[in-house]
Amino acid sequence: MGWDLGTRLFQRQEQRSRLSRIWLEKTRVFLEGSTRTPALPHCLFWLLQVPSTQDPLFPGYGPQCPVDLAGPPCLRPLFGGLGGYWRALQRGREGRTMTSRASELSPGRSVTAGIIIVGDEILKGHTQDTNTFFLCRTLRSLGVQVCRVSVVPDEVATIAAEVTSFSNRFTHVLTAGGIGPTHDDVTFEAVAQAFGDELKPHPKLEAATKALGGEGWEKLSLVPSSARLHYGTDPCTGQPFRFPLVSVRNVYLFPGIPELLRRVLEGMKGLFQNPAVQFHSKELYVAADEASIAPILAEAQAHFGRRLGLGSYPDWGSNYYQVKLTLDSEEEGPLEECLAYLTARLPQGSLVPYMPNAVEQASEAVYKLAESGSSLGKKVAGALQTIETSLAQYSLTQLCVGFNGGKDCTALLHLFHAAVQRKLPDVPNPLQILYIRSISPFPELEQFLQDTIKRYNLQMLEAEGSMKQALGELQARHPQLEAVLMGTRRTDPYSCSLCPFSPTDPGWPAFMRINPLLDWTYRDIWDFLRQLFVPYCILYDRGYTSLGSRENTVRNPALKCLSPGGHPTYRPAYLLENEEEERNSRT
């Protein structure tokens, strides 16, 4: 066995050497002006007749591995390397034998991009990469198909190798990061190495770095000698950028700081715009298990083929759906056809008219509901009137919302947010919430709290202890506060005699308690949240109807049931039939 393996290795090496000699001879004939030069495409086809079967000793070698066919440097500028030519041939063959996605654009229209994110801090988890999302989304809006994203360390050789690979494969290459004055900013050097170039000071960049003032910025003026400078307009100021975007061939070198990168790309969109292509997309939300609808999705993709791309993405954290479907096409027609196709085949009622931007569109949706004249709409209108009165009497710095992650205060926060959007759209102050931390909170509740802070752009005022102790601490640390909005309902303990505006009792820290939801019921709260697709704590979908700490909160026995497989489980809180059993979750 060992002798046979050695023999086959030797034979394979001899075969590779023979192909290399043939390649060099054909290249010499071409460069010397042979009469066969006009037949170059045929010559290239002949040269590409490498073994098409997989080699058991080298399974990566052959048509799937274009490295050996890259060709000499003198031909790469003409043909992008024979590896690129081979890949084009392979794509043509695959198109006849494989089901294609809509992302494979029509020949002649396709503009592609590869993104290289540079930085040890990304690979080590020190910094979260947000540039990739922005670059992919923006390029797609410009008609550019992003084919590959790579994250590489601050190493010259590694960056150079990736730049070389990407430059030969894609229309545009965008790098992000590694541009600056420090030792680990090596992107300029790496790109120079990738193209056999050298770093030289550029007069315009030298002037720009001097304008920055101080010392240590000289490194920014050292760019590959073949670099081009692009001066765009800053979308934030309307003024020309002080520092240009540097490019070398088809590689564009962006800063890694997200704020700068976004401004530069917004100001340089014209460099990448592909007017021949406009991508169209649609998102569908399905309240069904992904495995159960997988056959339907496979049939749909096979039915529409190259006309449309269908993606399926499960979401275990959503209150409203289990799977998000994305439909992508270069034309609107296939999207509508696929929507009708899926509507007719997915489980009845599983498509959810979900609004992913419920917080951003809160004002429009909440006030529309308030003006609907429905029973719930009248409750919403009454709550908004109380909130608007409080906004007239107090400034935002004097108000805060009592928030513990429960359903009632979640509804209240959404109402308050909508009213501020409508009445004070230009006020920059973030909304304030008072969070009284319990001794042993649910991790899911803590996560929901953090998500809510980001979602609504909140400032959290944190306190501990009983309500009285927390209000005292709040008053001492934030003396400007005068009123707290509460999600109290009359059915809550000791709340039947409250008014919309109720001062705290004697002996308590002096605050005005504002109660917009006094006349709401358990069903009103859930109808409001679910109709407007307001995110709420996931524990409510697991059988909890009233949330406290882990010591005093259990799933509501009234929601216990059997799953389709016969296992005990719990229905979500919004399906509780008897509202009087709401507090059965508390022990």
From Swiss-Prot:
Supply the Gene3D superfamilies for this chain: HUPs, MoaB/Mog-like domain
Q: Which residues carry this modification: N6-acetyllysine?
A: 378
Q: Which EC number(s) does UniProt give?
A: 2.7.7.2
Q: Is Transport among the key words of this record?
A: no
Q: Which residues, renumbered to this chain, carry the PTM N6-succinyllysine?
A: 378
- InterPro entries given for it? FAD_synth_MoaB/Mog-bd, FLAD1_M, MoaB/Mog-like_dom_sf, MoaB/Mog_dom, PAPS_reduct_dom, Rossmann-like_a/b/a_fold
Q: Which GO terms describe its cellular component?
A: cytosol; mitochondrial matrix; mitochondrion; plasma membrane
Pathway(s) annotated for this protein in UniProt: Cofactor biosynthesis; FAD biosynthesis; FAD from FMN: step 1/1
Gene Ontology terms for molecular function: ATP binding; FMN adenylyltransferase activity; identical protein binding
**Required co-factors:** Mg(2+)
| Swiss-Prot/TrEMBL catalytic activity | FMN + ATP + H(+) = FAD + diphosphate
Region (Molybdenum cofactor biosynthesis protein-like) residue ranges read: 114-205
Outline where the chain's transit peptide begins and ends. Answer: 1-17
- Domain of life the protein comes from: Eukaryota
Q: Which UniProt keywords apply?
A: Acetylation, ATP-binding, Cytoplasm, Disease variant, FAD, Flavoprotein, FMN, Mitochondrion, Nucleotide-binding, Nucleotidyltransferase, Phosphoprotein, Primary mitochondrial disease, Transferase, Transit peptide
Annotated stretches, region: FAD synthase: 398-555
SMART domains recorded = MoCF_biosynth
- List residues, modification Phosphoserine: 106, 563
Record text about domains = The molybdenum cofactor biosynthesis protein-like region may not be functional.
Please describe what this protein does: Catalyzes the adenylation of flavin mononucleotide (FMN) to form flavin adenine dinucleotide (FAD) coenzyme.
Name the associated disease, please.
Lipid storage myopathy due to flavin adenine dinucleotide synthetase deficiency: An autosomal recessive, inborn error of metabolism characterized by variable mitochondrial dysfunction. Clinical features range from severe cardiac and respiratory insufficiency with onset in infancy and resulting in early death, to mild muscle weakness with onset in adulthood. Some patients show significant improvement with riboflavin treatment. Analysis of skeletal muscle show multiple mitochondrial respiratory chain deficiency and a lipid storage myopathy in most patients.
Fetch the PANTHER family from UniProt.
FAD SYNTHASE, FAD SYNTHETASE-RELATED FMN ADENYLYLTRANSFERASE
What family does the database annotate? In the N-terminal section; belongs to the MoaB/Mog family. In the C-terminal section; belongs to the PAPS reductase family. FAD1 subfamily.
Q: What is this protein called?
A: FAD synthase
Q: Which species does the entry assign this protein to?
A: Homo sapiens
UniProt gene name: FLAD1
